[in-house]
Design a protein with these regions (language model features):
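Short, structured segments at the rim of ligand-binding sites
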Residues: 1-430
């Protein structure tokens, strides 16, 4: 079992290059099998979730050629099986995108119920509602979603709640349906737009992505394409919060600043200086942070995936801050770990009340999920002394070369796999 061992207390300073958006890439990889022609995708993040999904796609018969860690060629003409093995799918929640892709192309799909981070109930009822509206019969049998249709027909679909996954899945299923489909109360996230742009580059007719009403005119078939995935706004936001928490100065490169507006606004609110460039943002924290209130909301509101990282910065801010989580339950499981590092944080339902302290101290902590794991790494970098983060497999699901990028900013962090390695690190850093 690998761990991160960190000696904290130093400001992070320098430049960091952001990779492709994991959440966009997962959906785009699934959508790539919807044509029999070759699809070339670049700016792919080299993270565990991507590798698992590529294995699942290869397992159902598609040709997958990993040109480089950030490039792949996929050809869906050789798919021989519309049933995806549980072995792959139990590891990642985004496996459900194969439902929309397979159903859209073959009018039948069988995909096990998804796994991924344990951050509360994330039902897929809105996905299934959309598939049924398009004319599919959908059952859950032996732990798998089985969807079948004689044909798919466009419909007016109103989502009962804003759901990124459901918006994307319905968009894929409707791309080759007969007639017109309208999705109301659609998610507006940048990766929804990226998936729509990708499908359109394959010949789909999708309009309105990025608004709450998406209109899809079904086409007969999709063709091959070359496509570059947008930068990962959550990875970018994570480094922005790391600058804030460590009193650092980081230039975050290869980003779309508009996608970071909510994070930027909150960092400025707590006293950081944020400078925007065409494809970069610079975050400078030169004085003690100020308190604030933040509530997670669907895009363009403050993202739930940035809540733990920002909370770490607030543990060191002056005064009392309040963080309200309105998207997922159980998203404060990292709070007890922060308390062990000296944070004064109290969780009441979906709200965390944080009384800022002057310093955190290193401790052994465990990552409960992907974003909370990254937040605990930030806490370790800001803390005095040695921090050990266990269960970093969660972090590896969504951050490529995380420790390498942090070291380039001056962090003292290593990935280790034994107590002996930890002792060596402690001796080396004193």
């Amino acid at each position: 079992m690998e761990q991160y061992v960190i000696k904290g207390g130093n400001p992070l300073v320098g430049e960091v290059e952001i990779g492709g958006a994991k959440n966009a890439a997962l959906a785009i990889l699934a959508a790539a099998i919807m044509t029999d022609e070759m699809v070339y995708i670049e700016n792919l993040p080299d993270v565990r979730d991507i590798n698992v999904l590529l294995e699942a796609i290869r397992e159902i018969g598609a040709s997958v050629e990993r040109v480089s860690p950030t490039e792949v060629r996929i050809t869906g003409s050789t798919i021989a099986n519309i049933s995806v093995e549980y072995e792959y799918i139990k590891k990642i929640r985004a496996s459900y995108y194969l439902l929309g892709a397979l159903l859209g192309k073959y009018k039948t799909a069988e995909v096990p119920l998804p796994g991924g981070c344990n951050i509360g109930s994330r039902p897929i009822d809105q996905h299934l509602k959309g598939f049924r509206a398009l004319g599919a019969s959908v059952d859950i049998l032996h732990g798998a979603v089985v969807a079948k249709a004689e044909k798919l027909t466009g419909k007016h679909i109103f989502l009962d709640m804003v759901s990124v996954g459901a918006t994307i899945n319905i968009m894929m299923a409707a791309a080759m349906a007969e007639g017109n489909t309208t999705i109301e109360n659609a998610a507006r996230e940048p990766h929804v737009v990226d998936v729509a742009n990708f499908l359109n580059s394959m010949g789909a007719n999708i309009k309105g992505a990025g608004t709450d009403v998406i209109r899809i005119k079904g086409v007969e078939k999709l063709h091959g394409t070359s496509y570059s995935i947008i930068p990962d706004q959550i990875e970018a936001g994570t480094f922005m919060c790391a600058a804030a928490a460590t009193m650092g100065d980081i230039m975050v490169k290869n980003v779309i600043p508009k996608h970071l507006e909510a994070t930027t606004a909150k960092l400025e609110e707590i006293g950081c200086e944020v400078e925007e460039f065409d494809d970069a943002v610079r975050v400078v924290a030169s004085k003690r942070l100020k308190r604030t209130h933040v509530k997670t909301m669907p895009y363009p509101g403050y993202p739930t995936d940035m809540q733990p990282q920002f909370t770490v910065a607030l543990t060191l801010a002056e005064g009392t801050s309040i963080v309200t989580e309105s998207i997922f339950e159980n998203r404060f499981k990292y709070a007890d770990e922060l308390s062990r590092m000296g944070a004064n944080i109290k969780v009441e339902g979906n709200t965390a009340i944080i009384d800022g302290v002057h310093k955190l101290t290193g401790a052994r902590v465990s990552a409960p999920d992907l974003r909370a794991g990254a937040a605990l790494v930030i806490a370790g970098l800001a803390a005095e002394g040695i921090t050990i983060v266990d269960d970093i497999v969660y972090i590896q699901r969504g951050y490529e070369r995380f420790e390498e990028k942090l070291r380039c900013l001056g962090a003292e962090i290593e990935k280790v796999s034994s107590e002996k390695d930890i002792q060596k690190f402690q001796l080396r850093v004193g």
